[in-house]
Every structure is written in C-alpha cells, then in structure tokens.
Design a protein with these regions (language model features):
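Conserved small/polar residues in nucleotide/adenosyl-binding loops
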Residues: 699-706
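Conserved structural position within tetratricopeptide repeats
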Residues: 526-527, 557-561, 591-595, 625-629, ...
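Alpha-solenoid helical-repeat scaffolds
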Residues: 383-563
Length: 710
C-alpha cells in the first residue's frame, strides 16, 4: 500500500467517525490493520467490534444502560487512536517525507536517546555558555563562545526534530515536556521554539496529552509563551474539532482557563487574527499585480517631471512638486497605498510579498529556524549587525512590531549580501547620537513590553510563512489552506457565543467580504435581537451577495417592519424584486424611495428601468429625461433615452443621443444600436459603417459590455 492510499483510507475513516458511522469505520480500519499485519492492532480492533455488537444487541433488547453514551464515545475515540497509530506505522514503512526520514535516521543513529536525555544535553550546553559569558570582556574567548552557541543551536534543532517526531509518546515524554516547558529550566526563547515543534507533532497525529500541555502553556509567566501556546492550541483544536467533544479532560481544562481574566479576550483576538491571515494572499496579489506594475509604469513619467537641476541641488524639491502627487492620485497608486497602510495598521500581513523572495537562504533550510524568536546574536547573523550603530540597530529591529520574526531574519540575512563598506555606512546612521534614533527610542517602537496582540499576530505570520513557503511544505497539514473558523469548534462555544463576540466577529467578516461566515453570525444574533433592523439589513445584504434574492428580500422586509422609512432598506427591497423579475413590486418601492429622495439619480434611473421591463417606454423616457436634466454632463441616461426613443419611433431623437454617445466613450454595442437607427432612417451606408466599427471594437476592446454583444 502506497502513501497516498494509506492517507486516503486514514481520512475516509476520520470522515466516517465524524459522522459516527462506527460499523463502516471499522470496515475501513480493518483494511489498514490487515495491511500492517500486527496482531496487537488486530486484537484491539476485534475488541472494539465485539463491544460495539454487544452494545447494539443490548439496545435492541431494550436494556437500559446509563453508561451507553460514555461507552459509545470511548469506542469512537479508540477508533480514532487506532487509526492514527496504524496509519502512522504503515506510512513509516513507505513514506519518503522529512518526518519519517528523520525518524528512520534517529532510529538508526541515536538509539536509546530519549527526550529527557536530549533536554539534559541542551541544559548542560546552555549552562556552559552562561559560564563563559560571565567572564569579563577581556577574558572572554570569542571563538569558544561562538562554538558553544553553534552547539546549542544544533542541539536545539535536534531536540525540535525529536519533539516533532515523538509519536506515539510515552508517559516519560509527557513528563519531560512539562518539566522543560514550564519549570523555568530553559530560556523563554528556547521554550517558544519548542512549542512550535509540539504544534507540528500534533498536526501530524493528534495527542490529547500534548494538547493539554499547550493549554497549560497559557499559565506561563511569559506573555510570549502564553500567546504562542494559545495560538498552537487553537489551531490544533480547529483541525481536530470533530473528536474534541469526546475529551472530558479538555473540557475541564478549558473551564479552568475561562477563570483567567484575559483568556476569553485572547481567544477572540487570535480568532480575528486568523481571519486576517485569509487576507494575506489577496494583499500579496494586489501588491504584485496592481501596485508594483503601476509604479513601474509611472517611474519614467515621474522622472521626466523632475528637473535635473532640482534633483542635483535640492532633494527636498521632490516633496514640493504638486505634479508628482497629482500623477500618483490619477494613477490610483495613492488610494492603493492608503488601503495597504490602513490594513497594516489593523495588523494585516502586508510584507508577505516583500519577504517571500528572501526565504531561500540556507538558514531557512533548517525547519526549526522558521519558528525561532528573533535573536540578533544568532550565529547566522554573526558579523552582520556589528560596527558603529549596530547595537542600536539590534534594539530597533528586535523591538519592531511591524515585522514577524521570520522576516527579521530574512532582512538581516539580506544585509549580509550588501558590501561591508555600505553596510557599515548604513549602521553608522543608527548611532546613539543620531537625533532620529533617540526620538524612536522614546516611542512605543522601542518599548520592552510588546502587546499580547502583537505577539500572537507576529507568530501567526511566522506560521503562515512556513506553511506557504517552506521548501517541503506539501508534506505538512496546512491549517491556512482553508479558513480557521473557531466558531465551528463546539468546545469553544462558551467563549465565543455571547452577543458581543458574535457581533464583533460578524462585523469583522462583513467588512472583509466574507459574507457566508458573516451571515451565519448575524442569523444567530437575530434570534436574540428581534427588533434590530441593522442585523436584518446585513442578513439581507449577505444573502444578496450570495445571489439568494428570495431570502435577501425576506430579511429586508423584516428590517422594513422595524424601520419603515429607511431609504437604504427600501432600495434594497426594490432591487431584490427587480432581480426576481417582479418589476411591478420593484416599481412601488422605487416610488417610495423617490418620495424620500426625489432627486436621487440612481432611483430615477431604476424607475425608468422598471418601466422598460414593463414595456412602458414612454413613461420610462420621462424618468430618463429627468436624470439627464439633473445631470446633463454625466451622460448616465443617454443610452436608455436613445434606445427607448428608437423603440417608440422617435428616430431623430434617438439619432441625436447616439451621436452624443459616439462622441463620448462609445463601446461596440453603441455603434451596433446606432447602426439600427441609421438603417431605419434609410442611411444604409452610415449604418454599415457603424456595424463595421461595432465589429472592430468588439474584438479589440477589453470592455465587458463589448464582450456581451458577442
């Protein structure tokens, strides 16, 4: 059995167990067990099948068993565990992945070395380095210190791999993990790294005890460890959400954590950051496909606007050139930059496109380095951040909340490619005497305490980069491949189901265009807030965005009952009726909207459209002419006036308006319709000329209006 067949069977069984189809799950599990040819697994499966048959038999006989549900849940959980273990052992025999490759290597070359022993080795090396650093600067041996740092980094890397591949774990492994992570035995940066190894281990196969260890990390004294632990735990809980209700110990642990004053707020904030991570791909695409190409096109034009003598004499003249800003405004670059700046202020990941090309350094070939908290004294950065101003630069980049840890390493490693003389010159700008640097030290950027939100946001960005950019990323379960919706994790419902949380998360989804997710929350809110018209408006809008006009109309009508004279609601109701091909009903609501805003051009146009749909062209013309009167230069009503005039036989009037259209910005359909008018007036040659132009424009214009003609 090859790896893909094993994985498919594994996830088929997961699906059956999620639906609680135990008998079918046992049948597929038997295929895996038979392939493994392991008598212990065979006996375990037989035992589960026997218990299941007895339970069914007792139920059919009408025997009341108060323990039936707990027995059933235990069977489901046991089936999950057996599936995990059997599929893991089978994959270990044939899979070429990095995970199983390391397990085979460790088994062959490091037999008998437990996690506990690896922790002891690392502890001793850290103590050796601490002793070496206690010596005065004159007595310190730089090469020895660098050698010790290298050894610690290598040992930490091996330990990371050991924790990642530690499945199935023994009781001693759980004790070692707890002692290492939560007894102040190791530095916080070291513990922070190892938490990511636990996350990767759990994404490979579920382990209840390790999930509880992650949740216990929230009680650590370090905010960095607290937030990293919680991020990891929430990702794991979402991935394995179907089996969590079976774990009583998990529910008890969550109940205890709910007593922590910040736990609920932290969970909610991390959830919002997971939602933000879904924007990263969209932002990257906008940067690469819209902003950067526009700036490249604009570059030569901007250079021409800058007089060479101004450039040479006074660089500040650039800031004073109004034509420069005007060009940026007209090109739309200013708006795009403002949008990206606003997203960055909200914590969105706007640097993914910038740093994705800087992940090919050898540093990132080691899996553990993707999760390292930034350390400017890492041996990979040796000599890069030295010289005058280097210490200040280290402080600045370490404290910066704008870059995640992975991007900070990318930035510093890219500096190593800069010639030393230029790098020293740049570092010199960050000397302590520099007034700008002194000012920055006073600002929040240089504060030692970084907000909890920043910690989790940066860590999520680190995780996102690993799962999207690591060279062997396809071997991992990518939690960011879909949307991490914690509302679908039933054990977290007590934390997220209050009205404030539902409204906050719903508005967050709504603003970002995730209408299906927003709809789910607004409908839950509507059950509690029957008299809130805004909720029904947003429910209707979400349905409308999905193209479900019947349900949208139902929601808008409820909003109308609560706020009968709301202009926005009335217009939406009319729009729904129009899309449902009910122009009579739409017309009645557009007339109501007209009474509220008699000079609203959009309303007047839509009234005209409704009359056209009813084939009342004369009445439609009245409203189109009103629009043309209120906005004579806009030209919004020219096309409907021209076409309706033609339909009612006012050919000369239609001709005049088509001439205005063709003098403005005509599309293929305009020439096509103008040709009809000229043909009806007997101007055959002119009609043929218009038809030819229509065809030419149809195949040369990117306009959707033109393409629709074909």
């Amino acid at each position: 059995m090859i790896t893909t067949e094993i994985t498919k069977l594994q996830y088929d069984i997961y699906g059956l167990l999620a639906e609680r189809r135990l008998k079918d799950a046992f049948g597929k599990l038997a295929l895996l067990v038979n392939e493994l040819q392991d008598w212990v697994s065979r006996d375990k499966l037989n035992e589960m099948e026997t218990s299941y048959r007895y339970m069914i038999q007792y139920m059919l006989d009408g025997v009341e068993d108060p323990e039936r549900k707990s027995i059933y849940d235990h069977l489901v959980l046991s089936a999950y565990v057996l599936t995990d273990r059997v599929s893991d052992r089978l994959a270990g025999q044939v899979s070429p992945s990095q995970y199983y490759g390391w397990k085979r290597y460790a088994s062959a070359s490091r037999t008998g070395i437990s996690l506990s022993s690896q922790f002891d080795v690392c502890d001793n090396e850290i103590n050796d380095l601490s002793l070496a650093l206690l010596l005065g600067e004159q007595e310190q041996d730089f090469s020895k210190i660098q050698s010790l740092k290298h050894r610690i980094e290598d040992t930490a890397g091996n330990l990371f791999m050991g924790i990642w591949t530690n499945y199935p774990a023994a009781e001693e492994d759980y004790r070692s993990l707890r002692e290492a992570l939560f007894t102040d035995r190791f530095p916080d940066t070291f513990v922070s790294l190892l938490l990511s190894a636990v996350l990767l281990n759990l994404l490979h196969r579920f382990d209840e005890q390790k999930l509880l260890i992650l949740l216990d990390g929230y009680r650590h004294s370090s905010p960095e460890i607290q937030m990293r632990s919680l991020c990891c735990a929430l990702i794991v809980m979402y991935i394995y959400r179907e089996r969590l209700p079976l774990l009583k110990s998990l529910r008890n642990r969550l109940d205890a954590l709910c007593e922590e004053p910040r736990f609920k707020t932290d969970v909610r904030n991390i959830f919002l950051q997971f939602i933000k991570s879904q924007e990263t791909e969209k932002i990257t695409r906008k940067m690469n496909e819209e902003l950067l190409p526009e700036m490249m096109k604009l570059g030569p034009s901007l250079y021409k606007k800058i007089r060479q003598e101004d450039l040479m004499n006074d660089i500040n003249a650039l800031e004073e050139n109004p034509e420069w800003q005007e060009m940026l405004d007209k090109s739309g670059i200013t708006d795009k930059l403002k949008e990206l700046t606003d997203l960055q202020m909200e914590g969105a990941d706007v640097f993914m496109s910038t740093f994705s090309h800087l992940k090919s350094f050898p540093f990132f070939q080691s899996i553990q380095n993707w999760f390292l908290p930034f350390n400017p004294d890492h041996t990979a950065l040796s000599g890069v951040l030295s010289g005058k101003g280097g210490d200040t630069f280290k402080k600045m980049i370490s404290a910066s909340a704008l870059l995640c840890n992975s991007d900070k390493y990318s930035f510093c490693l890219s500096l190593a490619q800069v010639p030393e003389s230029q790098r020293d010159l740049m570092m010199g700008q960050f000397s302590a005497e520099n007034a700008a640097v002194q000012e920055m030290e006073k600002e929040e950027l240089m504060k030692k305490e970084i907000s909890r939100e920043n910690i989790s946001n940066r860590y999520i960005q680190d995780l996102y980069r690993f799962f999207k950019l690591y060279i062997r990323r396809t071997e991992f379960t990518d939690p960011f491949a879909g949307h991490i919706n914690l509302l679908h994790v039933s054990v977290l419902n007590p934390l997220l189901s209050d009205s404030d949380s539902l409204r906050l998360i719903g508005e967050y989804y709504f603003r970002r265009g995730y209408y299906a997710e927003a709809l789910e929350l607004f409908e839950r809110l509507s059950a509690a807030y029957h008299s809130d018209s805004e909720i029904y408006q947003k429910i209707g809008f979400c349905y409308q965005k999905k193209g479900d006009y019947a349900n949208a109309l139902e929601a808008f009508l409820k909003a109308e009952i609560i706020s009968p004279d709301n202009f926005w609601t009335i217009r939406r109701i009319a729009t729904c009726y129009r899309n449902m091909k009910k122009p009579e009903m739409a017309l009645s609501y557009y007339h109501r909207a007209e009474k509220i805003q008699p000079e609203n051009l959009s309303v007047q146009m839509n009234i005209g459209h409704c009359y056209v749909e009813q084939k009342d062209y004369e009445e439609a013309l009245k409203y189109y002419f009103k629009v043309d009167y209120l906005d004579p230069e806009g030209g919004k009503a020219w096309r409907p006036i021209a076409w309706c005039s033609f339909l009612v036989g006012k050919k000369e009037q239609a001709q005049r308006y088509y001439e205005k259209i063709l003098d403005d910005k005509p599309v293929s359909l305009d020439y096509f319709n103008a040709g009809h008018v000229e043909f009806s007036l007997g101007h055959i040659r002119k009609a043929i000329d218009y038809y030819r132009r229509s065809i030419c424009l149809l195949y040369t214009s990117p306009s959707p209006r033109d393409r629709s003609v074909s």
